[in-house]
Amino acid sequence: MRTSDETRKAHASYALYDAGGRVEASGVADAAAGDEAFTVGSVALDWLDADGLRAADHAVTLDRWPSGRLVVSQLGRRFETFAAAVREARDRARVSGFLAHGLDDPLPFTGAVLEPAPVREARLLLYATHLTVVPKEDDPFQVPYGAVAELRPDAARHALALETAGGAIVLGHVARDTDAFHSALRTRRDAQAKRLADLTGETVFADGQGVARSALHRIDELLRAFAAPERAAGLAALLDPADPPEAVRFGFVELLDLDERLAPAARELPEHFASFLLVPVRGRVILEILAGPSAATYVFEGDIEEINRDLQALRFRRRPLALSGKEAELTPSNPYRLALRKLPALQRLRAAIRARLNHGSGWEAALAKALDGPVG
C-alpha cells in the first residue's frame, strides 16, 4: 500500500556531500519523498540514482550515484514515519528501475530472504507473472514463476524454498501470513502453467523457458500453429543452420513491455503472450519472436541455456536490448540507466549481441552473414 502524501513530507535539516565529504548544499527546508525523486531545498535526488538508504540516529542518509550522499536530519517525532515513507517511495521506483515491476498491482508480504546468505529483511511482492523480492539493504530482484522448478516447504524454518536453475531461494519470516504467502505464490505459478498447458495440450511449458526439440515431439506442429504468417515464412532460414538441431527451443512468454501485435497466429495467443524460438548455431543463438509483439531477430554469442535464462529473467524485454550505444549512455534522462548499470542479465545479454536484424528485404542474407565467421 502506498503511503499517504502527508507522511512523505517533513521539515528537516539537510546536507549534500560530494565524494570527498565537502558540503555541496545545505540548509533547513521542506523535504518530500516523491514518486520519482527525493527533494529538499535546492536538491533533487532521483530514486534511480539513490543507491543506498540508511535510517539511523534520527537521520536518513541516501547514497548518490556515482558519488556523494544526502543526509536529512532533525526530523523529530516524524523520523520513523518519514523514514518508512522514504523507503517505500524509493523501493517502488527502483523496482521499476530494475525492470522488476508488473502490469498488475502486486500482493505484498513482509518477510526475509534466508538463502542465499546473509539473512535480509525483505518485502515480497507477488505479481501475476513473477515474484519481486525487495531486500531492505540490497537491490530488488525478480523470480519469474516459469523459472521456479519446484516449491519446497521448509517446515523447520516456516519458510518456502524456490528451486531454480540458479540455485534455491529460501523465503521466510512471514509470521502469521506464512500460509497465505505460500498459497498465493503457488496459486499464481500453477495458474500460469495451466494457461500454457490448456493452450498447447502439453505440460512441459513454463513461462519464458524454451523447451528443446528433443523433449517436444510436436514442435513442428506447434511452430506452425503459433507463428504469425510473416514469421512462419522465415522458419526454414532460422531452423536450417541449427547445430545441433535437437537443441532448438520453442516456448512462450508473458510480456511486460507491450507493443502492437503482429497478424495473429493460426491459434490465438492469450493476451500479452508471445511465442519464441531459440536456435543454437555453432556458439551463437538466434532469438526470434514468432508471434505477439513487433520484434527484430537477435543473434547472441553464448550458450543457449544461459541466453534463455537471462532472457527469462529480463522477461524478454526488447526495448533495453535495442538501445544503441548512444541511447544506453547513463544520462539523467535515460529511464533504463539503473538496469543498464546494475542488472546482470541485461548487461550480459547486451554484451552478447552480435546482430539485431529488422525483418524485410535482405533479412535472410543478413541472418546468414551474422551466423558466419568464427566465434569470439
Language-model segments: residues:
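Hydrophobic residues embedded in beta-strands of well-ordered beta-sheets
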Residues: 32-39, 60, 131-132, 158-160, ...
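Polybasic phosphoinositide-binding surfaces of eukaryotic membrane-targeting domains
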Residues: 25-33, 38, 119-132
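Acidic, Ser/Thr- and proline-rich intrinsically disordered linker/docking segments
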Residues: 1-16, 49-115, 146-376
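N-terminal targeting and processing segments
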Residues: 20-21, 28, 35, 243-245
